[in-house]
Amino acid sequence: AFSGILADADIAAALKACEAADSFNYKAFFAKVGLSAKSAEDIKKAFFVIDQDKSGFIEEDELKLFLQVFSAGARALTDAETKAFLKAGDSDGDGAIGVDEFAVLVKA
């Protein structure tokens, strides 16, 4: 799903680092997976991969399954992780993360 944007080895390392429940940290994940160093264009491409229902927003249910977008066998985020991730990214308080909010979150 992220071919041409992210390296498989980086994805594997990032997923391994947050295997344990409640160990997910979006800043560490985006850095490890190599997304925070990418261009605005690549970050936008990644957003549209994560936006599974193509609504133009990443909603809470998509955040919960965020890691599975990177690898089908990855775990779901816990409710606490999901809520913290949403709170960090949802700067306008509409309950979802838009493409611009996502770009800010990745570069945070």
UniProtKB/Swiss-Prot annotation:
| GO cellular component terms listed in the entry, alphabetical order | cytoplasm
| Keyword line | Acetylation, Allergen, Calcium, Metal-binding, Muscle protein, Repeat
PROSITE patterns hit by this protein = EF_HAND_1, EF_HAND_2
The keyword Lipid biosynthesis is assigned to this record: no
Chain positions recorded as Ca(2+) 2 binding sites: D90, D92, D94, A96, E101
Entry-linked SUPFAM superfamilies = EF-hand
Provide the residue positions that the database annotates as binding Ca(2+) 1: D51, D53, S55, F57, E59, E62
Q: Pfam families, per this entry? A: EF-hand_7 (PF13499)
From the Swiss-Prot or TrEMBL record, what is one GO molecular function term? calcium ion binding
Q: Which residues carry this modification: N-acetylalanine?
A: A1
The EF-hand domain, residue ranges: 38-73, 77-108
Q: Does the record's keyword annotation contain Cell cycle?
A: no
Q: Tell me where on the tree of life, at the top rank, the source sits.
A: Eukaryota
In UniProt terms, what function does this protein have? Answer: In muscle, parvalbumin is thought to be involved in relaxation after contraction. It binds two calcium ions.
The text of the family note is: Belongs to the parvalbumin family.
Q: Print the miscellaneous field.
A: Is regarded as an important allergen.
Q: What is this protein called?
A: Parvalbumin beta 3
Its organism's taxonomic lineage begins at:
Eukaryota, Metazoa, Chordata, Craniata, Vertebrata
